[in-house]
């Protein structure tokens, strides 16, 4: 099978991937961007983004990622669905295999694969994923309506999830390792003043 040759290959479609695509396209590098398993990245599961410049009233993660996607397309980014499954980065041109079948040779590769939810590593945790264990309040929050729930973590993501769930659940416990929260002050205040 002959490899497709491209100037610039971007792997990942979160904010970093789309931003790289916008700049690469404006520089006439004809970027090809593979969106991965979750087009738009982890931000698509976030309800309110309030700390990104340019959105004074805040914006949903889905809307923000749609905006970035459209902007990347507007400048000529070739957006494709697929997952990088192998890489040979030993010399240029770099070779990336997509979905274990298509090989792409790229002069430049930008890897923007982003983040994924962290699990605790408890026994049977993955077994109960989607059946009481969740890593996405906006995805699964409806199932916990009027129930007692617990969120593990003390950072912004955990506090945002707890705040969202407080609108659905009867009670929300925030479980943290340390005697303090690591979240931004505004998120701490929001969580602490909610009676749930």
Each predicted region: which residue ranges?
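Rossmann-like dinucleotide/flavin-binding elements
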Residues: 2-5, 10-36, 129, 135-184
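N-terminal glycine-rich anion-binding loops that anchor highly charged ligand groups
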Residues: 33-45
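Active-site loop signature of alpha/beta-hydrolase-fold enzymes
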Residues: 39-40, 87, 118, 180-181
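Short, glycine/charged-enriched secondary-structure capping and boundary segments
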Residues: 24-25, 46-49, 123-127, 164-167, ...
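N-terminal Rossmann-like dinucleotide/flavin-binding domain of flavoprotein oxidoreductases
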Residues: 44-103, 184-196
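FAD-binding core/adjacent interface of flavoenzyme oxidoreductases
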Residues: 1-11, 32, 77-147
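A generic "binding-loop/recognition-motif" signal
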Residues: 39, 48, 83, 115-116, ...
């Amino acid at each position: 099978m002959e490899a497709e040759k491209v100037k610039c290959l971007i792997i990942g479609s979160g904010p970093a991937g789309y931003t790289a695509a916008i700049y690469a396209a404006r520089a006439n590098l004809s970027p090809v961007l593979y969106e991965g398993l979750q087009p738009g990245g982890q931000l698509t599961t976030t309800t309110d983004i309030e700390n990104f410049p340019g959105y004074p009233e805040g914006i949903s993660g889905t809307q923000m990622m749609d905006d970035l996607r459209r902007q990347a397309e507007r400048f000529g980014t070739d957006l494709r669905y697929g997952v990088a499954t192998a890489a040979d980065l030993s010399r240029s041109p770099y070779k990336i295999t997509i979905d274990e079948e298509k090989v792409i040779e790229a002069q430049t590769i930008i890897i923007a694969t982003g983040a994924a939810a962290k699990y605790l590593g408890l026994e049977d945790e993955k077994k109960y994923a989607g059946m009481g264990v969740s890593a996405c309040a906006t995805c699964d929050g409806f199932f916990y309506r009027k129930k007692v729930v617990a969120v593990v973590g003390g950072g912004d993501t955990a506090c945002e999830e707890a705040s969202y769930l407080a609108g659905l659940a009867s009670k929300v416990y925030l479980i943290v390792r340390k005697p303090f929260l690591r979240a931004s002050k505004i998120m701490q205040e929001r969580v602490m003043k909610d009676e749930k």
